[in-house]
């Protein structure tokens, strides 16, 4: 029998009978239980639906700590089925960005190879990951109001994909609470107003950290002015509609939060309404203020009841 050449052997190994039937290393299944592992920065990606889009206010302090001490605890990572890269599971995108910076600056291996805790991708993976990041970000530096609002809008999207139906604000609040991120329904309503009516006009102001109370004031002002506009514009021909007017006025005040004055917004908006509606400024302002007061009375959260005083027990004679 003639001796096989290396080329003949390679041809036989590539024949049908010798085709690989097992899974490749790239497609082996992930662990089915929490498992410590070491991964490299090349294998990790930030969570793509992270609600935080602005720089963590504690970024410099966190970076200094990691440079000196490393990570305090292994970050939790996971992986979507069929994907090549791991992602941060709960929070941690800031720490991942810092590790990349430190690796680029120092080339120290401890910033490139990271001890992590792998946690399997759960059945409700997207919503579990998102609510986990929302909760973790609240604990580590907090989120701006608009970041929370956009995160909750994304959560609504995931819940509606999961259930196949639209959710009311109260049902959204119930589901968020059940998944470990409680948000009052009244806050969800304000967040919806911020995303729908305020964000297109004042993104710099909102991402700069405009808080809930200022957002409340703008939302109440918008609604009060809209009601007054609808009543006074009825049967009239007006050059613009209220939605356009509100956006045009508000855009002028897209500045940093420290320079923002809601009263200036109100003065400008009422002034332009008075001109377009051919109405007296002071009369219009009184109508709007009255409407604002009634709206606040209807939407304000009830005060917590004052606990009853303990009965006074007379001292023994």
Which residues are covered by each model-predicted region?
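Long, charge-rich C-terminal accessory regions
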Residues: 226-233, 237-317
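Amphipathic, charge-rich alpha-helical segments that serve as recognition/docking helices
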Residues: 100-104, 108-171
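Short, charged amphipathic recognition helices of the HTH superfamily
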Residues: 159-177, 185, 237, 241
